[in-house]
Each structure stands twice: as C-alpha cells, then as structure tokens.
Amino acid sequence: ESKWGRASGLVLLLPHGYEGQGPEHSSARLERFLQMCAGENIQVVNCTTPANYFHALRRQMHRAFRKPLIVMTPKSLLRNKRCVSSIDDFTKKNSFHRVLEDHAYIKGSKMIELTKDKKIEKVVMCSGKIYFDLLEAREKSKNNRLTIIRIEQLYPFPAKTLAKILKKYEN
C-alpha cells in the first residue's frame, strides 16, 4: 500500500503440504509468506472447515479495507470425512473464526467426551490439517483431558482471542 499507493484485495489459494504426491506437486512455503509479514500488510490463513474457508473469502470481499489474503489449501482436507460444516455454519449469523476450539465441545459430535475445562490437563495448539491427525490420535488413546485448539489465522496473529480461550483452562 505505502509503496504503490494502492490497496489490493488479491486472494492467493496455495497448495500446502507435499502429502506424498511426489516432486512434480508444489507446496507453498508457509514460512516464506510469514517472513514477508510486517505491519499487518497481508493476511495469512490456514482454514480447517469449509465454513471458515467460506467466511474468510466473504470477509475479504465485504471489508471496508483491502489487504492481500494468502490461503493455505491442503488437498487432503477435500477428502477428509471429519472436515465438514453444517449448513447453519455458512449463514450470516456466523463469521470467520481466527481460532477454533475443539470439535469435541460441539453438542452432538461423535467424539470423545472431554472433561470440564478446569480439569483439562493439556492444551495442544496447531494449525491446518495436523488437527485431524491429532484428533485421531486422541481418539485412539481415549485421552479426555487433552483439548486441541486450531489457529486459523496465522497473520495478523490472534493473540487476544487465543488468550481469552486459554484463560478457561486453569491447569
């Protein structure tokens, strides 16, 4: 903006993760985009639900200001059976979530039932498709004292939102 005197609403959908596809498939280097971040010049997101992906694109178009949006898009999430959203998640009463709490807290989820917030012993923070790997490992170990938090927006980092969520877990 300051260099060219123009705001850009550019959206880059970048493949992320080799996922065993071989050398002919590219992988966006997330760390390189994060190195270019300064002064809230761009937004970098790594969405793990269809609704959050939708709301990130919707937010990009409806904001009063323009910043480039970098979206990391691993192909494996397209086929992941746990990577789903309900129709209600796409409505206007919902919005983009910079941080998502554990799916196990959603009523009606077919996941392990976690203990109350005060009795949670470990909080794991992650971003992207690794969440579903961690979820599967927790299900296998039947650990109901571990919660997994997903950081969906990597830059600008949602420190206040994350601090508010972490405050619930006393241990």
Locate each region found by the language model.
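Conserved thiamine diphosphate
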Residues: 1-118, 132
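Short glycine-centered, acidic/aromatic-flanked micro-motifs in structured strand/loop junctions
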Residues: 14-16, 126, 150-153
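A conditional alpha-helix N-cap/helix-loop micro-motif detector
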Residues: 26, 50, 127, 155-159
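Short, surface-exposed connector motifs at secondary-structure boundaries
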Residues: 38-41, 116-120, 143-146, 169-171
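Acidic/histidine-rich
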Residues: 123-130
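Generic long, charged, amphipathic alpha-helical segments
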Residues: 131-170
